[in-house]
Amino acid sequence: AHAYALTGDAYLELGELDEAISFYKDAAAYKSNEFFTPKYLTKLAIAYEEAGDLKNAIATYEEIETKYSDAYEYSEARKQKARLEGLASN
């Protein structure tokens, strides 16, 4: 999973957002666990936002909120989801 995420990071740096999104999805889906999966989902949400896909970015942060409430990323996911919901409603 970590290799998928690192590849996603490289594509994100290159601005190849569709590829980054694909690799982050693979990273999050590979042997899901409480520690790494929320990290990969956060990267996925960021890539969605950079691609202008606020709906999927919000849904990804929502997934972190509902499935990983004990994760370090939980509070940041809540904050970013609220921010994006505000942008989406304008």
Give each language-model segment a name.
Residues 1, 28-36, 65-76:
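Short solvent-exposed coil/turn linkers within tandem alpha-helical repeat scaffolds
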